Amino acid sequence: MTSNAHATDAAFKALAIAWTTREGRILDLFAQPDRFERFSVAYGDLLIDFSKTAITDDILSQLLELARAGGVEAQRDAMFAGDHINLTEDRAVLHTALRDQASDTIQVDGIDVKPGVVETLARLGDFATGVREGRIAGARGGVITDVVNIGIGGSDLGPAMVTLALAPYHDGPRCHFVSNVDSAHITDVLKGLDPATTLFIVASKTFTTVETMTNAATARAFIVNALGEDAVGAHFAAVSTALDKVGAFGIPADRIFGFWDWVGGRYSVWSAIGLPLMLAIGPDRFREFLAGAAAMDEHFRSAVLDQNLPVLLGLIGLWHRNACGFPSRAIIPYDQRLARLPAYLQQLDMESNGKSVTRDGAAVSRPTGPIVWGEPGTNAQHAFFQLLHQGTDIVPVEFLVGAQSHEPALKDHQDLLVANCLAQSEALMRGRTLEEATAQLRAKGISEDKVAEIAPHRVFPGDRPSLTIAYATLDPFTLGRIIALYEHRVFVEAAVWGINGFDQWGVELGKELATQFLPAVTGGALPPSASASTSGLIAHLDAVAGG
């Protein structure tokens, strides 16, 4: 074990002791009248309040020491410098270059990638503007009214999430997303679409992703059957680097937009993968989105650790995961247009940090990535908040809420939304004692026998941690900041855990086996290594399908 690893291990042990020996409850910490001021940090209008966690001054100091011991600053600087920090794939990690609006040059392996980034963004802008203005039209001259993005994973979750989030800024064609190879997905999306006014974007770096190419073939047939083979080029664009394969599909070179191997799929929404968003909101708004992320990048690089939002968010995550032993975190945006944010963050976090070996291939010595899940409020309150408040597992909650909505005429809705968000975080912390529950029931005139029967069911343990991310309005700039905040939070946690947060070998085995099992599903033989369970399931599915 290196000296750095020794320091990290010692810091984790000290934090675990701080948790197990703590006295009192989170609510008791508010005896300090300035707790909110000392345990919340703002960057412009974007504020993180973590005062409703069990973190104290001493614990925060230990967490900051953990960040230093884990080499967060050095690893951060290595990422921005273009070093190959993705060791298993021998790649740089520079999605930040896609939104960098300050640097004159960005070096990767001695090559300045800035001109290519600028050129690609300009090409995307020209194409999006042409479609939005009707100059780039369908094969029969029809203005494009609908765009269907076909991708999966990072080629779907990112653009789908941000396009929904920025719906108030849509002034271009309607955007739809197809990801699942389930025929129901593309069938339902294509219903009601006019082939003559529909543009498909096929997003696959290699142009070989099975789910994406299966859906792309169906979309191609949709166009060919209605408009003829010659119409394919006018109704498709591609985000890919496989020029030969894309050309063979029928998509002309001027409709192919590439990105680089130093951009991971779950970090690619800033690249040509974000084309659906640009078509929906326009190039200028898209640049505002990039600018928000760039601002958070600069904050991450320059802010001192105890005022650094991504660092603090990462350290809070490490505290809850490793010191407190909480295995999951819930993301609850009080904004319906952020409905896809929890799913997006599931991939960002769980695909990055769901690792069981360190960067050098040794087994990790402590739990790593948590289970990330959630739904928007207030819907979530009527679904799973029962467990959050009274269940046997403690789940740290991360609330997101804006001060203003995009519907000023419905301010009463926003007021109710904000009140619910604040009430839930307060209730999770405060709880309700048996004495309070008893007094509340007695005040209603209920008999003593009934009070004794019901009161235990109305007790809330409380002392359940949450943090709140608050901002003015969900606009393109703010959304960019929020996504980059979470990207860097995941980076901080991976750095301290000593894992590679930029590969995803865990997705490979299932894909390999699916290729082996497909012949058996279609009537052939299973490989000898398949289990009796798989054989039995195939036989049952074949029987009930009438095969």
From Swiss-Prot:
Pathway assignment: Carbohydrate biosynthesis; gluconeogenesis; Carbohydrate degradation; glycolysis; D-glyceraldehyde 3-phosphate and glycerone phosphate from D-glucose: step 2/4
Enzyme Commission number(s) from the entry: 5.3.1.9
CDD domains: SIS_PGI_1, SIS_PGI_2
Any single biological process term in GO: gluconeogenesis
UniProt keyword terms in alphabetical order: Cytoplasm, Gluconeogenesis, Glycolysis, Isomerase
Places the protein is found: Cytoplasm
GO cellular component terms listed in the entry, alphabetical order: cytosol
A Pfam family: PGI
Residues at the active site: 351 (proton donor), 382, 511
Entries under SUPFAM superfamilies matching the protein: SIS domain
Catalytic reaction equation(s): alpha-D-glucose 6-phosphate = beta-D-fructose 6-phosphate
UniProt xrefs under InterPro entries: G6P_Isomerase, G6P_Isomerase_C, Phosphoglucose_isomerase_CS, SIS_dom_sf, SIS_PGI_1, SIS_PGI_2
GO molecular function, one term: monosaccharide binding
Top-rank taxon: Bacteria
Record-linked HAMAP family: G6P_isomerase
Recorded family membership: Belongs to the GPI family.
Function: Catalyzes the reversible isomerization of glucose-6-phosphate to fructose-6-phosphate.
Name this polypeptide is given: Glucose-6-phosphate isomerase
Species of the source: Xanthobacter autotrophicus (strain ATCC BAA-1158 / Py2)
Gene name of this polypeptide: pgi
